[in-house]
Every structure is written in C-alpha cells, then in structure tokens.
C-alpha cells in the first residue's frame, strides 16, 4: 500500500467542479488553489479583474485548472447569475464554497442602514440564494458538497462586529438546516469557522496594530494568527470523498482560541 492510495481515497478532487466565491485573494484564494492542486477544476469568483486574473494565472501556473468568473454579488439575481455562469464555464457544479464576505467594525449603536444591508446582503442573503440556485446541479453530483465560510462569531460573541456576527451565526444555522433537508439528495453541507487569519484585509485592519497583535498572541494558545493555507486541510477534507458521512457541522480552525483561556500566568 502507498500513502498516495490513501490520499486518492480520502482527498482527491479529480473530475470535480468547484465554485469558490471571493476566491481572488486571502482565504478564498488559498482554498481555490488547494482544490485545484487536488484535481478539481475551479471557478475563481471575484469582482476585481486583475485579482481574478492573477489567481487564475497562479493556479494554472502550478498545473491546476481554473477559470475566471467576475460577477457582482449583492442580490438574489446576482446569485442566480453567478451559478448559471459557473455551470456554463465548468459544465456543472459538484462543490460550492460560499466564501465571499464583508465586514464593518463599529459599535451596534452606530450601525447605519447602509452598512447593515451591505453586510447582510453578501454574508447571509447571497449565501442562501447561491445554495438554492446551486441545489439542482449539486443534486446531479454523486455527492454534492457545500462549504460555508463562517467565523469565530458562528460559535461565540465578539464585540464591535454585531451585524457581521449575526450573519455568521445565521450561516451556521443555515448549514444545519440545509444538511437536514438535502441529505436525502446526498448533498453534504458544512461550515468552516476560521480564527484570526492573516489576509490582505486583516493585515491592514487588525495585524497592523501592535496592541491588537499582542492581545491575540496572548489570547490564542498557539500565540499567533493563522495563515490562509492553514485552513485548507479542513477545507479540502470537507469537500472530498473522505467526508461523505459528515454533514451539518461547523469546524473551527482557530489555533485553540475557542478552547478557552487559562487562569494561569502564561510563560
């Protein structure tokens, strides 16, 4: 026996067609790259032409197969159009990764209707509509997979991001509901809850602040923020053949953050 046989049996995505939203940078780019390396043909969704092109070029340069899909994502119509374009370019959809998202850091009392709608539309509304539009295509797959990107706020509260946290908690609930409704169609639906991950977005707004970095280094048991690539092992498992009996679950990849804190002095 060889380790290659184990990989093929549990993790190979050969012949699979995956749509990853928000795939032109950060976590989405890492997931799209990983899936292509595992053998999938990946639809790289985004809204920035250059970032999409760079990601597609990077994946194809590694010997993978990726196609660009530029599409606004803020409504039911946008969601349906995106799925239709992905099916046209990929020939179908076996895997849907709902990764696109946005955030505004502000106290709940200061949230405006504009900011509220901007966060809700991308983080929650479009996740629902994308799943609904993709369902007929996933049903045709031998084992369709949906992976929703949640957050620590899917599982716990964090101040200053009330609307964002609300959407991610709802995504966790949606994950369970769809898992229950679509298990009969052999569609598995799971949620990935990243911790504090270093991406272009968080580098500018979080990891550039020495005080916040010091807090995270103290609070996270592994004493550092994570890299997008450190999410890809779980992201691959949850859409691969090895997770064919895993559905309705949320998996945190957070360096131990949600395990709790210690009352002992840190060394």
Per-range role (PLM):
Residues 136, 180-184, 244:
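Alpha-helical segment proximal to the catalytic Tyr-Lys
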């Amino acid at each position: 026996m060889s380790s290659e046989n184990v990989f093929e049996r549990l993790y190979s995505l050969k012949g699979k067609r995956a749509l990853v939203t928000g795939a032109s940078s950060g976590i989405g780019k890492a997931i799209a790259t990983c899936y292509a390396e595992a053998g999938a043909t990946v639809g790289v969704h985004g809204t920035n032409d250059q970032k999409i092109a760079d990601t597609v070029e990077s994946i194809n340069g590694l010997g993978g197969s990726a196609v660009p899909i530029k599409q606004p994502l803020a409504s039911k119509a946008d969601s349906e159009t995106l799925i239709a374009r992905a099916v046209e370019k990929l020939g179908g959809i076996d895997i849907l990764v709902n990764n696109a998202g946005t955030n505004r850091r502000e106290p709940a009392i200061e949230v405006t209707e504009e900011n509220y709608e901007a966060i809700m539309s991308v983080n929650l509304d479009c996740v629902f509509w994308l799943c609904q539009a993709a369902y007929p295509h996933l049903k045709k797959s031998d084992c369709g997979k949906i992976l929703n990107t949640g957050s620590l706020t899917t599982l716990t509260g964090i101040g200053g991001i009330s609307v964002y946290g609300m959407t991610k908690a709802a995504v966790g609930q949606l994950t369970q509901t769809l898992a229950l409704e679509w298990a009969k169609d052999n569609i598995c639906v799971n949620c990935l809850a990243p911790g504090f991950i270093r991406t272009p977005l968080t580098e500018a707004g979080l990891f550039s602040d020495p005080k916040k970095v010091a807090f995270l280094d103290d609070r996270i048991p592994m004493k550092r923020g994570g890299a997008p690539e450190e999410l890809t092992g779980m992201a691959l498992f949850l859409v691969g053949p090895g997770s064919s009996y895993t559905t309705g679950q949320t998996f945190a990849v957070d360096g131990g953050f949600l395990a709790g804190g210690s009352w002992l002095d840190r060394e």
